[in-house]
């Protein structure tokens, strides 16, 4: 493991490695033992705090999108500088607390908290654990998501499996509640959906990349599927015009309803990404 003033690198004996920025506790790269990059990072990404980094795994806390009282979309965790809490083997943990900045003055957030994120890599897996503690004297309500940008070789060929007949809020249609009747999700245009009460495991199938990414999650009931497609990609300053073709966001989180955490209690969740390389993936 190596570290600098702004980022931490972790490695595994198999050859897998990852890079995490202290700004946002933001993982920007994860390569498995084969050397294949699993995470999309825009070539136009701006590394100038407090701006959020485009791509990687942004940590949306204490609010996902506008699901909360803050005017700041996706909260402030991804815009804040975290500190290294611990390092051991192939693992790094980073921490952010309400004492680290004036979140009340900057964002209007009143509650006291600490949030710990732990990244661990193995040959073909990335484990992400989150622990949120209410350090204040009253109940704290929040929403959150791990806004993972997955790299795919061709968005028109990739698909998501495991959300058949799961209800979702369509953010492109006034968040109308709908149900997906397709056995798998293929992206053929802009998509922005919040799937609620989802199964514990879903899969991204990337046939051109000859891989499957299995997403396992614990205490993260909701999944967001997002791709900006052509026009929105062109309107986004820190995103390449053609980059929508090589990314797919599948974001695990707790969005609706919000988590309500009593004083002195902790909430814990985990996401496990497993890459299966298979030349016969279709």
Segments from the language model and where they lie:
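Hydrophobic residues embedded in beta-strands of well-ordered beta-sheets
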Residues: 8, 27, 92, 126-128, ...
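Acidic-aromatic substrate-binding/catalytic surfaces of carbohydrate-active enzymes
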Residues: 13-72
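Short, hydrophobic/aromatic beta-strand segments
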Residues: 29-31, 138-144, 282
């Amino acid at each position: 493991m190596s570290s600098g003033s702004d980022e931490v690198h972790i490695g595994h004996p198999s050859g897998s490695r990852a890079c995490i920025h202290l700004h946002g506790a933001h993982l920007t790269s994860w390569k498995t033992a084969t050397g294949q990059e699993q995470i999309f990072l825009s070539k136009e990404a701006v590394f100038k705090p407090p701006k959020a980094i485009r791509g990687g795994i942004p940590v949306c806390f204490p609010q996902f999108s506008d699901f909360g009282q803050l005017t700041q979309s996706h909260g402030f965790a991804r815009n804040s500088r975290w500190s290294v809490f611990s390092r051991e083997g192939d693992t790094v943990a980073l921490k952010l607390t309400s004492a680290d900045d004036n979140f009340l003055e900057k964002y209007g957030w009143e509650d006291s908290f600490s949030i710990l994120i732990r990244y661990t890599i193995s040959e073909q897996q990335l484990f992400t654990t989150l622990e949120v503690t209410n350090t204040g004297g009253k109940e704290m309500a929040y929403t959150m998501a791990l806004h993972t940008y997955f790299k795919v070789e061709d968005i028109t060929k990739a698909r998501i499996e495991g959300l058949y007949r799961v209800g979702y809020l369509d953010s492109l249609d006034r968040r109308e509640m709908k149900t997906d009747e397709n056995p798998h999700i293929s992206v053929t245009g802009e998509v922005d959906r919040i799937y609620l009460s989802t199964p514990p495991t879903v899969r991204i199938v990337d046939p051109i990349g000859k891989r499957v990414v299995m997403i396992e999650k614990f205490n993260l009931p909701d999944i967001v599927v997002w791709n900006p497609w052509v026009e929105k990609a062109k309107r986004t300053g820190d995103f390449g015009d053609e980059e929508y073709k090589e990314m797919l966001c599948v974001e695990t989180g707790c969005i609706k309803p919000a988590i309500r955490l009593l004083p002195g209690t902790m909430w814990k969740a985990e996401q496990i990404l497993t890459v299966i390389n298979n030349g016969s993936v279709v």
